[in-house]
Amino acid sequence: MNYSALLKQLLPEAVLVITALVLLGVAVAVEAKSRKAISHRAALWIAASGVVLAGVALWGVPVTGDGGTALIVMDPLARLFKAVVLALGLLAVMLPPARREIAQPGEFYALILFALTGLLLTTGTNHLLFLFVALELASLSLYLLAGFSRTARSGEASLKYFLFGGVSAAFLLFGLSLIYGFSHAATLTGVATALGAGPPSSLAVTGLVMVVVGLGFKLAAAPFHYWAPDVYQGAPATTVALVAAASKAVGMVVLVRFLMIGFHGAAGSAAWGGVIAGWSLWMAVLAALSMVLGNVLALAQTSVRRLLAYSAVANTGYLLVALSAHGESAAGAALFYVIVYGLATLGALAVTAAVERDCGDDAPTSFAGLVHRAPWQAVALLIFLTSLAGIPPLAGFVGKFALFSTAMAESTHGGSPGLTWLVGLAAIMSAISLYYYLSILKQAFVRGGPDGEPSACEAAPLSIAHALAVGVPAVTLVVLGLFPALLLDPITAAVMDSLVMR
């Protein structure tokens, strides 16, 4: 093994770990000297600087062609999504948690950096054991971050997240063990080779089912989503942003790699009139459950955070629609949409955090009169929610159109005939989602307060970091809506280079 080359590939992760250790050291030194914890602002900017430096380090890491057997992968897909994770992580760091609830900001932001390290490592591997270890590094950090607020609700969120996460980790590890037992290979390319030698055994099928269950938890796919509403409502906004944006993007990359590299030969078909056993049918069932449950349950929510949690479940369903088609173009569309979804949800959380600070809660009525007290926040919220709803000309519309059109194309011309039923259900559920997204916008733009009276909330100025967390995603969604090829073409090329050529 060439350790110098390996170290160079791990340079972004090394930068994050070193920054986290420096931050912890500075926090200890400050507390020892002044008997006070390091300030939130100082910890935030140290962490943000580390993420930026990791991005600079990633820029200098070359793409390699040995992703089929290497422990660490730096193919075009890994490089692209490591950059995406760092960008989403930087925006999440910019979201300030409630200061009265975070007693140790040094530890809080260090855990964020450790979580990002785990997500980067997960993005860049095809090795089964290393995949599990990296994913759990990120997960353990997120469990702690979910309970960092000194509130009962945050503690409940952390406990549920940990318990459900522990069960999903057990499923994932057991599934990976069974797949290794079937293939006698520790890499996805080795699994694909074993699968090509004959029909999949019961070990392989059972292992894949358990892996899908484990990854379904990470993606908040129904029926593995029960942790999501409590975590979205109780955890600090920064943690929720990481879970909703960066963690979901990485989970989708892992699922795409697993299905398109390791088990592409066992896809089967989810056709309405010609079902063939395989993971395509599983993806279709999970997609239908996620879309229906996510959208229906979102209609009854009185907390915007919980509404966004069920929105996450529904959007996972849209992503799985594309994977049901098991084509390269559909995989590219899913990866494009998961980025767009992450930006829109992160931005919506940033505005929600500002409303919570000003009004004391995240009820839809707290958004009443937002256009009068904070006009640019209201405009940004309009961009985020209409993008999630799939209204043109924003990036969310382009993403959903790409998802549904590629699934239909595969349905008509590709290897998955008869997916029209699933695309039709997705279109209906997307239309239903308009109601709960627009109900928030109605409060923000039409009503002056909970009872039609002027809002009692007063908008305080946003910090520079918080303003960036609101403004950057909004501008990006508009630009990607007008010029989607800026991101869609690189993703499509990365999918072709990284998955098809294995």
Where are these regions (language model features)?
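Alpha-helical transmembrane segments of multi-pass membrane proteins predominantly involved
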Residues: 1-502
